[in-house]
A protein has these predicted regions:
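Extended hydrophobic leader/signal-anchor segments used for secretion and membrane insertion
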Residues: 1-164
Length: 164
């Protein structure tokens, strides 16, 4: 017969080991993506001097009311960003000088070309309709992997200082 105390100690030991391994992997830059916003799998985050369109970045979303709403609804978890939100893994779709057009009911357009899977969902407040010229040190993050991705169609441009 296995004693309950032994089972408890074993469970605690295994849990501690799992948390330790997770912490080590995280400190080495490894991230497990389970969302549809990027290919599912194990990713490694590395610092870069420059960023370009197509690069995936780990980013803290801007401090906006839509971010807090998404946390309150359970769509975003709390985390280690300055706003107490988890970092997001997103592809850079737009850089300095690019023109972003957002129109309700239509996919986002970059320099006149529509991006697939970027029509905002009617149940979530989208970034205001308009045409935006991307500024220095500003990026827009749009995931074409999933129409349900939470990205710049909702929170707008992101300063590159938000990249982790």
């Amino acid at each position: 017969m296995i004693r309950p105390k032994l089972i408890g100690i074993t469970a605690l030991t295994l849990t501690s080991c799992l948390f330790s391994v997770t912490a080590v992997f995280h400190s080495l830059g490894f991230r497990l993506n389970t969302t549809a916003s990027a290919p599912v799998g194990l990713w490694r985050v590395q610092e870069a001097v420059t960023y370009q369109k197509g690069d995936f970045v780990e980013v803290c979303p801007p401090d906006l009311s839509i971010i807090r709403v998404m946390v309150d609804k359970g769509y975003l978890a709390t985390g280690n960003c300055p706003t107490n939100v988890i970092t997001l893994l997103k592809p850079i779709a737009v850089g300095k000088g690019d023109i972003v057009t957002i129109r309700k009911g239509l996919p986002v357009s970059i320099n006149g070309r529509f991006l697939p899977n970027t029509r905002s969902m009617p149940t979530i407040q989208a970034w205001p309709d308009g045409t935006y010229l991307t500024k220095e040190n500003e990026i827009w993050l749009f995931s074409t992997y999933s129409s349900g991705s939470f990205d710049s169609r909702y929170f707008g441009p992101v300063d590159i200082s938000n990249i982790r």
